[in-house]
Amino acid sequence: MLARFPLYLRLVRMDKPIGSLLLLWPTLNALWIASDGRPRWPLLVIFTLGTLLMRSAGCAMNDYADRDFDRHVKRTADRPLTSGKIRAWEAVAIAVGLSFIAFLLILPLNTLTKELSVVALFVAGSYPFMKRFFAIPQAYLGIAFGFGIPMAFAAVQDTVPMLAWVMLVANIFWSVAYDTEYAMVDRDDDIKIGIRTSALTFGRFDVAAVMACYAATLGIYVWIGVTLGFGLAYWVGWAAAVGCALYHYTLIKDRERMPCFAAFRHNNWLGGVLFAGIAAHYLLAGN
């Protein structure tokens, strides 16, 4: 078992934390806004660990669902499950075990948060199979990656206001943007094996679609900033996020594999500066 532990870590992408951060930034945004800049430390610990666990569980489930496709994709052919180094039942067991631990974390929280966690689990577990049916499965991913937003509001306020759902919509647009960049890396392989992705659906308009999704995301955050009366610190963070999005255009405009992958990875900075703007606003406002 100990000899297989490094394989399990690779299965859940512990060597690639970018995915966890893409889940964590929107969740932290929601925690800070829901608590007026004063989130309780227990909630921060619960949601941070829960994000890491559920992202890891999702990776294991994704590899299980895609095991027959991944062997035909250059980037994924050497994954532990695809290459036969671990078995399918092990991936499922890890996904179930990590999900159970994540659920244990939220047991001290209110009933609404626990009810929402069931929905979140269903969405996260079903996402890997959406590539067989949906033309833009990345939109479904945005729901899965963003469900920490309504859960955070529920945990803090025991209700989910309209603002939380608006933030979730922003996250859906952001997910379509960055995961389309990711899908542009595998475009040729995905055409061969018949998987549906937003990069294929958008076709020659893929770059324009990515930039439109960034514009929608950042436009919603303009509405959030104006509605909540955020100050200069927030707008500096927002402007930095705009700069990140414009930089991504320079990376993806020629549709080359490695620059597209670099753009995907750089979304950690886009999410990070948005959160920094929110946190800085509350800090400077005395909260």
Swiss-Prot record:
Q: How does it sit in the membrane?
A: Multi-pass membrane protein
What is the protein's name according to its record? 4-hydroxybenzoate octaprenyltransferase
Record field: transmembrane? 41-61, 89-109, 133-153, 158-178, 202-224, 266-286
The protein's organism comes out as Burkholderia cenocepacia (strain HI2424)
Q: Which family does it belong to?
A: Belongs to the UbiA prenyltransferase family.
Briefly, what is this protein's role? Catalyzes the prenylation of para-hydroxybenzoate (PHB) with an all-trans polyprenyl group. Mediates the second step in the final reaction sequence of ubiquinone-8 (UQ-8) biosynthesis, which is the condensation of the polyisoprenoid side chain with PHB, generating the first membrane-bound Q intermediate 3-octaprenyl-4-hydroxybenzoate.
Q: What Gene3D superfamilies is this protein classified in?
A: UbiA prenyltransferase
Q: Which PANTHER family match?
A: 4-HYDROXYBENZOATE POLYPRENYLTRANSFERASE, MITOCHONDRIAL, PRENYLTRANSFERASES
One of the entry's Gene Ontology molecular-function terms is: 4-hydroxybenzoate polyprenyltransferase activity
